[in-house]
């Protein structure tokens, strides 16, 4: 059950529209970043910059508590960054590896990503249950995303 008091006592229809905004921004951002990355033939920073933006915005999100517009804006842009990096990111393995090595690396990346899909919500839920707040979990998420961006900066893939 959704507690409307946590959503500024908005009607369910208003909440629905607010929840639809981040995926819409992500759709636009992912399309634009993918197009830009292909046009410029550059992958690394087209992946790193959206991730870094998402990390910063998720880290700042707890500071927006009490301001609906800033909170929704922070999550809209953060979700956009979390999806915008994907086209450039998925082009990178085949730039460094070929054939079965590229296929194996993509499989490994997917497997590790699926582990993140399990551990992320588990840790976030544990932090919320332990502290009574999602703030620590959001900081954990922001740091995890920032580490991912840092890894991509230093990944030895030539000239990207």
Language model regions located:
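Multi-pass alpha-helical transporter architecture, strongest
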Residues: 142-160
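Helix-to-loop junctions at the C-terminal end of transmembrane segments
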Residues: 28-42, 128
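A membrane-interface helix-boundary motif in multi-pass transporters
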Residues: 125-144
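Paired intracellular helix-loop junctions of major facilitator superfamily
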Residues: 92-103, 132
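Loop-to-transmembrane helix entry
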Residues: 9-24, 104-108, 136-139
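C-terminal transmembrane helical hairpin of 12-TM major facilitator-type secondary transporters
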Residues: 41-92
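Transmembrane alpha-helical segments of major facilitator superfamily
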Residues: 18-26, 113, 144
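Short, small-residue-biased leader/transition segments that mark boundaries at the very start
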Residues: 1-2
């Amino acid at each position: 059950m959704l507690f409307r008091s946590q959503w500024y006592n908005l009607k369910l229809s208003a909440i629905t529209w607010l929840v639809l905004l981040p995926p819409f921004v992500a759709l636009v951002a992912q399309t634009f970043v993918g197009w830009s990355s292909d046009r410029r033939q550059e992958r690394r920073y087209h992946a790193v910059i959206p991730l870094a933006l998402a990390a910063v915005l998720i880290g700042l999100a707890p500071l927006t508590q009490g301001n609906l517009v800033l909170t929704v804006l922070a999550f809209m842009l953060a979700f956009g960054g979390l999806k915008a990096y994907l086209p450039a990111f998925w082009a990178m393995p085949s730039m460094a590896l070929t054939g079965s090595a590229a296929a194996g690396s993509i499989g490994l990346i997917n497997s590790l990503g699926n582990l993140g899909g399990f551990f992320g919500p588990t840790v976030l839920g544990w932090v919320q249950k332990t502290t009574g707040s999602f703030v620590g979990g959001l900081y954990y998420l922001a740091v995890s995303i920032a580490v991912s961006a840092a890894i991509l900066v230093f990944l030895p893939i030539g000239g990207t």
